[in-house]
Curated annotation (Swiss-Prot):
The modification S-nitrosocysteine is found at C93. The modification N6-acetyllysine is found at K59, K82, K144. The keyword Iron applies. It comes from Leontocebus nigricollis. The lineage of its organism: Eukaryota, Metazoa, Chordata, Craniata, Vertebrata. Involved in oxygen transport from the lung to the various peripheral tissues. Heterotetramer of two alpha chains and two beta chains. The keyword Metal-binding applies. Residues 2-146 form the Globin domain. The modification Phosphoserine is found at S44. GO terms for molecular function: haptoglobin binding; heme binding; hemoglobin alpha binding; metal ion binding; organic acid binding; oxygen binding; oxygen carrier activity; peroxidase activity. This is Hemoglobin subunit beta. Keywords: Acetylation, Heme, Iron, Metal-binding, Oxygen transport, Phosphoprotein, S-nitrosylation, Transport.
Length: 146
């Protein structure tokens, strides 16, 4: 992902304020609610029968935290996202058979959740930088599929 110095600064400054557990759980939960077909990958998580059940499910929250932990690793290696996410790409492609489009959807949901959490601090410039990052991460996660 090519970011200007200003964009990198905007991304890392905001990310330093992110509660990974809270935002991760909310982002994954919203993905599962808005795109219910994605729930098929999480059948072992128990009750996903309603939006409230999804958003309050401890396994959804825990996995969301794990997902954003990996995203944090990506932010530390923006010039090598494919290498950073190679093992996760292989896992999601070969073992889990996740449609790579879901990575793009989750990235867009994450941007919405960040905007909701940070309000005016999530300026159009910050949003544009995050769109570049989530697109780069989604592309790296989809790499094994190509």
């Amino acid at each position: 992902v090519h970011l200007t110095g200003e964009e990198k600064s905007a991304v890392t400054t905001l990310w330093g304020k992110v509660n990974v557990e809270e935002v991760g759980g909310e982002a994954l939960g919203r993905l599962l609610v808005v795109y219910p077909w994605t729930q098929r990958f999480f059948e072992s998580f128990g009750d996903l029968s309603s939006p409230d059940a999804v958003m309050n499910n401890p396994k959804v929250k825990a996995h969301g935290k794990k997902v954003l932990g990996a995203f944090s690793d990506g932010l530390a290696h923006l010039d090598n996202l494919k290498g950073t996410f190679a093992q996760l790409s292989e896992l999601h492609c070969d073992k889990l058979h996740v449609d790579p489009e879901n990575f793009r959807l989750l990235g867009n949901v994450l941007v919405c959740v960040l905007a909701h959490h940070f309000g005016k601090e999530f300026t159009p410039q910050v949003q544009a930088a995050y769109q570049k990052v989530v697109a780069g991460v989604a592309n790296a996660l989809a790499h094994k599929y190509h």
